[in-house]
Every structure is written in structure tokens, then in C-alpha cells.
């Protein structure tokens, strides 16, 4: 876990909230021309339009306008009617894919390249830049086939590099690897209780997995007097899927308690709703642990977070609460595939939150919870996200293809 100064947190918030009211209203009217200022105030009140007050002025999240048209039901309907549903293609793909993999294991082999570029002159010429990039974790549904650099195994799976900064030039770090990913779906009618073998995954893990009063109240509402662990976990999964729409997230490092933030704002990205799910599960005595990395579905490749829960007679099973209920299907196994199931379009990098990198960073991290975008620093301090760019490419390859030759790719 990284401890940031108040000044650093405020600096990061200013980066995330750059737009004033006039700019935000203009951006909303680009999509919905006739919207009134009264309606904007109602969206602010409902938390659909996210802002903070900085130096006495309302400043809006850099992705607040797009999030508005995701989280407010009427605004979302308007957006879909005008532009179409940007998630329809993924739903169509899953509607065909998921029935094909239930009852068997699907395997995919991917070639993955990740590049991080520190902007020119962020670091003085001649200084050493230290860099950590993501790599495949040891995970039972994932096998590393080839990598051109040794992988450091910890909570966060990394490869480490150093380079010397040059004046006027970006400092570029790259890694490449090939891995196999497998799908999993556990279908069971067993409702027996688990044994309490994994107690470290039931306890609080501050600052985000904490059994606060809002968590206790919500648990009462969702769980009631239910004692069966499988049923409790499924009820939590269903409640989040029904009540918390996906929205792009502000930086986790600027949020005191992520599950409470989700409940207050009534939206969250994949990691935020996963932390809420994990906290509610742990509060109810269900072991839960973090898993994250990337989702690799064609045209939807992105960073992604999910988790695992432990139930007796099943052991650890994956849960992707962000993918949630598949509402296009009437088949219960399809609808709840991502409760105790995962597809093969995944890259796992992290097996927990807020771990230490290998070798350890000297300064605070840019991302204090997760690790996907890479981390960089020099002897003068951390290099934050606004000072570097990253990108990745992924290619599905034939299982029979030979591993790539690391000598032809280089470090």
C-alpha cells in the first residue's frame, strides 16, 4: 500500500478533474443539444455527473460526460437511440461464445506486447529510469509459453528494466510474451458450507476492504437471514449487477474507500465493483481474493479486474461481477456464467492488491491498488501517469505455432 501526501493526492485529483462547468455543459449539449441547466443540476445531485470542488469551483471528471450517458437511465436511452449501444457487439459475441464453452474447456493462445514510453525531458539527461511492466502471473487457468525476459513473481507479476534518459527523446520500454489461457465454468447444485481454511481472505484489508456501517447495512438488505454461502454470494452478485452500472473510474489512489465511493456515487468500473463484491463476501464469511490483468475480447481489449471466491466442494471459483448477469439469455447457466465462471479471453497479471513490486519501488506508486499500466521512477521521484504513455497489442495465434524467438525481438 502506498501512502500519498495530501499535496500529491490533490495534484492527482486536479489532473482527473480538469473541466469547468461551461466546458462540461458544452460537451453535454454536443450530445443532447436541448438539455437544460436545471437538468444538469439534477444529474449532479443524483451523482450521475461527477464533480469535485477545487479552489471554490466545481470541476468535472475528465470522463464525466460519457459516464453520464452510461449511468443515468434516461440519458443512456437517449445516447443509445442516437449513437447505438457500444456494448452490443460484445454481448452478441458472448451470446454465441458462452453456450459453446459451458461443459468444456476452451483454450486460447495469445501473443501480447506492451510498451511504455516516458515523455521527453521528464527526467534529466543521463539519469537512470527504473521501469516495471506487466507479465503473466502463475495461475491455474494460464500458462506462460514464451517470454524474452525473466518474470518476477509476487502479488503483481512484473518484468523490470532500467534505461538512461536522453535529451529530447522519449524513453521506451517494451516487453513481449506468449501465453495460453483457459476458460472455466463450475456448475453445481451443492449448497454445503465451506470450511474456514482461508481466513486471511475473510478479514478486512484497509483502506478499501473494510466492514463499515454502509457495508453492514447493505449486507442486511441483500442477505437478510440467509445462511447458505453460495446463495449469499449469488445475491450479492445479482444486486451489484442490477444496481451499479459500469462507468470509467477516477484514479483509485485519490479515493479513501472504494466500496463506499461506489455506494455513494452508484456507479463503478470493474475494479471498484469487484472490491465492493469482495468486501460484502468477506463480511459474510466468504473468502474472496483479487484477480486482475487484461480482457482480450476482440475490439474490447482493455485493463480488467475480477476476483475469486471460495466455497466448500468447489474450492476457488472465478467471479466477474463487472460482466455481471447476461441478460440476453433465458438460460440460467448463461445468465450467471460469470458467477463461478470465466472465459478464455483473459491475461492474469495480479493475484492480490497493493502488493510490493519486484524489485521494490523507492517512491510511491502511480497506482496504489492494482498494476496494469506499468510503473516508472528515477532518483528524483515517481513518474506519474501524466508523464508517460502506454499501449499494448494482442494477437490470437494458433496453438501449434512455434514460440517467438526472443533474440529477434530484444529488450
Each model region followed by its residue ranges:
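Short, well-ordered strand-loop elements centered on a beta-strand within folded domains, enriched
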Residues: 141-144, 265, 316-320
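A broad, low-specificity signal marking well-ordered, structured residues that form hydrophobic/aromatic
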Residues: 112, 129, 173, 261, ...
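Active-site nucleophilic cysteine motif
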Residues: 229-236, 265-281
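Acidic low-complexity segments
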Residues: 154-160, 165-264
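Intrinsically disordered, low-complexity N-terminal segments that are enriched in acidic
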Residues: 2-185
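Alpha-helix N-cap/loop-to-helix boundary motif
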Residues: 228, 262, 266-269, 295, ...
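Low-complexity, Gly/Ser/Thr/Pro-rich intrinsically disordered linker/tail segments
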Residues: 341-411
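Hydrophobic/aromatic-rich core segments of domains that either
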Residues: 272-361
Amino acid at each position: 500500500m502506498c501512502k500519498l501526501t495530501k499535496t500529491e493526492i490533490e495534484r492527482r485529483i486536479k489532473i482527473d478533474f480538469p473541466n469547468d462547468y461551461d466546458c462540461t455543459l458544452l460537451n453535454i449539449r454536443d450530445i443532447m443539444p436541448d438539455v437544460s441547466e436545471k437538468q444538469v443540476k439534477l444529474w449532479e445531485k443524483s451523482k450521475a455527473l461527477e464533480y469535485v470542488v477545487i479552489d471554490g469551483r466545481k470541476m468535472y471528471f475528465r470522463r464525466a460526460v460519457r459516464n453520464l450517458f452510461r449511468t443515468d437511465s434516461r440519458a443512456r436511452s437517449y445516447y443509445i437511440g442516437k449513437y447505438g449501444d457500444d456494448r452490443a457487439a460484445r454481448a452478441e459475441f458472448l451470446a454465441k461464445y458462452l453456450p459453446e464453452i459451458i461443459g468444456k474447456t476452451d483454450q486460447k493462445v495469445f501473443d501480447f506486447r506492451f510498451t511504455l514510453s516516458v515523455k521527453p525531458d521528464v527526467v534529466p539527461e543521463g539519469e537512470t529510469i527504473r521501469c516495471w511492466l506487466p507479465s503473466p502471473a502463475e495461475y491455474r487457468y494460464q500458462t506462460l509459453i514464451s517470454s524474452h525476459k525473466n518474470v518476477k513473481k509476487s502479488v503483481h507479476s512484473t518484468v523490470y528494466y532500467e534505461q538512461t534518459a536522453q535529451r529530447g527523446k522519449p524513453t521506451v520500454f517494451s516487453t513481449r510474451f506468449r501465453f495460453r489461457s483457459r476458460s472455466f465454468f463450475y456448475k453445481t447444485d451443492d449448497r454445503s458450507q465451506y470450511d474456514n481454511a482461508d481466513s486471511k481472505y475473510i478479514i478486512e484489508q484497509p483502506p478499501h476492504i473494510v466492514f463499515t456501517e454502509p457495508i453492514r447495512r447493505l449486507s442486511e438488505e441483500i442477505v437478510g437471514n440467509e445462511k447458505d454461502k453460495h446463495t449469499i454470494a449469488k445475491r450479492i452478485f445479482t444486486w451489484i449487477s442490477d444496481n451499479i452500472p459500469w462507468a470509467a473510474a477516477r484514479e483509485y489512489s485519490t479515493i479513501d474507500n472504494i466500496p463506499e465511493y461506489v455506494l455513494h456515487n452508484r456507479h463503478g468500473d470493474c475494479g471498484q465493483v469487484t472490491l465492493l463484491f469482495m468486501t460484502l463476501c468477506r463480511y459474510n464469511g466468504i473468502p474472496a481474493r483479487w484477480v486482475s490483468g487484461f480482457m482480450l475480447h476482440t475490439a474490447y481489449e482493455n485493463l480488467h479486474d475480477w476476483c475469486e471466491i471460495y466455497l466448500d466442494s468447489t474450492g476457488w471459483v472465478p467471479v466477474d461481477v463487472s460482466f455481471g448477469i447476461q441478460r440476453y439469455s433465458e438460460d440460467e447457466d448463461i445468465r450467471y456464467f460469470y458467477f463461478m465462471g470465466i472465459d478464455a479471453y483473459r491475461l492474469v497479471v495480479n493475484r492480490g492488491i497493493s502488493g510490493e513490486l519486484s524489485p521494490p519501488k523507492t517512491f510511491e506508486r502511480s497506482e496504489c491498488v492494482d498494476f496494469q499500466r506499468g510503473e516508472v521512477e528515477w532518483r528524483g521521484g515517481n513518474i506519474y501517469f501524466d508523464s508517460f504513455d502506454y499501449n499494448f497489442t494482442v494477437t490470437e495465434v494458433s496453438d501449434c505455432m512455434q514460440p517467438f524467438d526472443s533474440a529477434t525481438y530484444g529488450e
